[in-house]
Swiss-Prot record:
Keywords: Amino-acid biosynthesis, Arginine biosynthesis, Cytoplasm, NADP, Oxidoreductase. Belongs to the NAGSA dehydrogenase family. Type 2 subfamily. This is N-acetyl-gamma-glutamyl-phosphate reductase. It holds the Pfam family Semialdhyde_dh. It comes from Rhizobium leguminosarum bv. trifolii (strain WSM2304). Its main location: cytoplasm. It catalyses: N-acetyl-L-glutamate 5-semialdehyde + phosphate + NADP(+) = N-acetyl-L-glutamyl 5-phosphate + NADPH + H(+). The gene is argC. GO terms for cellular component: cytoplasm. SMART domains: Semialdhyde_dh. Pathway: Amino-acid biosynthesis; L-arginine biosynthesis; N(2)-acetyl-L-ornithine from L-glutamate: step 3/4. It is found in: Cytoplasm. HAMAP family: ArgC_type2. The active site is at C117.
Length: 310
């Protein structure tokens, strides 16, 4: 019998993308609440408790409520895509390539917290350097990023795509999170192995899907002898054998004159780059991904597959 999967919040942006990725699969059975019963709390609870894996695509409070509904049913495993549990030590963090043991942690977990889109890029760049001893304690990490507007969900999609919307957004690019208290900072800090919170400056561009995350570094403030080449080597070693997260060779990065935020649109992979001039004192680390791919729905399906393989 095929494992039963219930997407709680299947009509939202992330939920719809997960359904698209699972269309045509015969190795799982998708449970669904009829459109007319979407607000039927009893039916929702029954669906949650009938699933082998429940994927929660909900706001934080609704996710917490859903987890309570299945807390006594050990037959139900959960993947949550909200920010509610990402730094909870009782949950496995769903970034399988984060370190060599993380995929096995996800396989064995009952509860998996799907990473945020920005943290996927930031942690993907920072954690290998912390693990290799290149990024010292106390380093003032800065993360700059731009996302496609689908990361803002249905409301922002309407604001960006409908010029008649009462709160239409016409700017081609805008900063937000100006008080420096973005909800993704805690998971960047915890899973990036940082001893102080990074300065995080997020922004949105007038494109639907895609993301660039940048972490600029001063080499002179890193571990003694750290170079652009040693940083690249640490990333290559960390992601050796991985197919979803890849490190672009230095020669290929050097040949680029620009990085296109939408290059990986529709893909569930992530590319990492190291930019700089050999012998210079600065480097810029860049992660390229689809905010709805490896940054959300693609990661959720990847985590589901790992859990089903356990």
């Amino acid at each position: 019998m095929a494992p039963k999967i219930f997407i709680d919040g299947e009509h939202g942006t992330t939920g719809l993308q997960i359904r698209t990725r699972m269309a045509g699969r015969r190795d799982v059975e998708l449970l669904s609440i009829p459109e007319a019963e979407r607000r039927n709390a009893a039916m929702r609870e029954d669906m949650l408790n009938s699933a082998d894996i429940a994927i929660l695509c909900l706001p934080d409070d609704a996710s917490k409520e859903a987890v309570q509904m299945v807390s006594a049913n050990n037959n139900v495993r959960v993947i949550d895509t909200s920010t509610a549990f990402r730094v909870n030590p009782g949950w496995a963090y769903g970034f399988a390539e984060m370190d060599g043991a993380q995929a096995d942690r996800i396989k064995a977990a009952r509860f998996v917290a799907n990473p945020g889109c920005y943290p996927t890029g930031a942690i993907g760049l920072i954690r290998p350097l912390r693990a290799a001893g290149l990024l010292p304690d106390g380093y003032p990490v800065t993360v700059n990023a731009v996302s496609g507007y689908t990361g803002g969900g249905k409301q922002m999609i309407a604001q960006m795509e409908n010029p008649d919307h009462p709160d239409a957004i016409t700017a081609p690019h805008f900063l937000y999170g100006l008080p420096l208290t973005h909800k993704h900072v805690p998971e960047m800090t915890v899973h990036g192995l940082l001893d102080r919170a990074p300065i995080f400056s997020p922004s949105v561009g007038k494109f639907a899907q895609g993301m660039i995350v940048q972490v600029p570094l001063h080499l002179g403030d890193l571990a003694e002898g750290t170079t652009m080449e040693s940083i690249h080597a640490a990333l290559v070693a960390h992601y050796a054998g991985q197919e979803i997260v890849t490190v672009v060779p230095l020669a290929e990065s050097k040949a680029l004159s620009r990085v296109n935020a939408v290059e990986l649109e529709g893909k569930d992979t992530m590319k990492l780059f190291v930019f700089g001039t050999p012998g210079a004192s600065q480097v810029n680390l860049v992660a390229l991904l689809d905010n709805l791919g490896k940054g959300a729905s693609g990661a959720a399906v990847q985590n589901m597959d790992l859990m089903l393989a356990s």
